[in-house]
Regions:
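Flexible, low-complexity charged segments
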Residues: 1-99
Length: 99
């Protein structure tokens, strides 16, 4: 999913940010193409999810995996609502930067 997602955080008075690039893993190309129509809703939901996270939690591997699972569930929810099926198996973080 391009462009990469960027979220800003304020931690202990310091500005921090997260940048994450995502790939959707699915088996049916036609379903993935159909899901692209709903990309604005998917991106909005993911931005809201990412910006609502605790920065300190994201700095741990467990926190990153939990976020990946929540992001996967968010996209699957939109797919189920709009297309009547889950469509994607997983979202994969292909790049994850915290600063």
């Amino acid at each position: 999913m391009a462009p990469a997602f960027v979220a800003n955080y304020n931690q202990n008075g310091r500005q921090r940010y997260m940048q994450v690039s995502i790939t959707m893993l699915g088996r049916n190309q036609a379903d993935l193409e159909a899901l692209k129509v709903h990309m604005p809703v998917i991106r909005n939901n993911l931005v809201m999810l990412f910006s609502g996270q605790d920065f300190a939690t994201l700095a741990t591997p467990v926190g990153q995996e939990m976020l990946r699972q929540k992001a996967t569930a968010s996209v699957q929810e939109v797919a189920q609502k709009e297309l009547g099926k889950v469509v994607i198996e997983q979202l994969l973080f292909t790049n994850f930067v915290l600063q």
